């Protein structure tokens, strides 16, 4: 694995970084979901599939695996969108200082998870444009 990253192209390294950020976000989301009882399997699977696609691009190293970057971004985008929709009770209660929805938790973990997924998606998008030829076996 060490040699794989040492000889990897910039796009692969960025995709690896995106996978690590996404994995960290997945762990944070799982803890948040279990503690505040907001866990959603579809969000979890979308974020996990984003990690798998980003890592698949790094490990497969072929022309066919280039689409895995975009698949990772699509999965992360779907996951963060669904997470945002699922967190509307927290947004409504905390921003309006009411308890209409009886939400648990604060905005800090919600905003943190959203920002981490955005960071991961942006790094993955940048990795799509960094193919310098070393990353594709013939």
Set out the residue ranges of the language-model regions.
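Juxtamembrane loop-transmembrane helix junctions in multi-pass integral membrane proteins
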Residues: 2-13, 34-35, 56-63, 67, ...
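Interfacial non-cytosolic loop connecting adjacent transmembrane helices
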Residues: 35-42, 81-112
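Loop-to-transmembrane helix junctions at the membrane interface
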Residues: 55-87
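Alpha-helical membrane-associated segments of multi-pass integral membrane proteins
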Residues: 97-135
């Amino acid at each position: 694995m060490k040699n794989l990253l040492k000889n990897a192209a910039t796009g692969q390294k960025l995709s690896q970084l995106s996978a690590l950020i996404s994995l960290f976000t997945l762990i944070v989301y799982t803890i948040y979901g279990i503690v505040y009882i907001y866990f959603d399997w579809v969000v979890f699977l979308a974020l996990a599939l984003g990690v798998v696609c980003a890592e698949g691009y790094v490990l497969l190293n072929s022309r066919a695996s280039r689409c895995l970057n975009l698949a990772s971004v699509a999965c992360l985008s779907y996951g963060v969108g669904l997470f945002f929709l699922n967190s509307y009770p927290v947004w409504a209660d905390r921003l309006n200082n009411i308890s209409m929805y009886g939400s648990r938790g604060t905005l800090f973990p919600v905003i943190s998870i959203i920002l981490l997924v955005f960071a991961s998606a942006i790094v993955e998008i940048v990795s799509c444009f960094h193919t310098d030829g070393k990353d594709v076996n013939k």
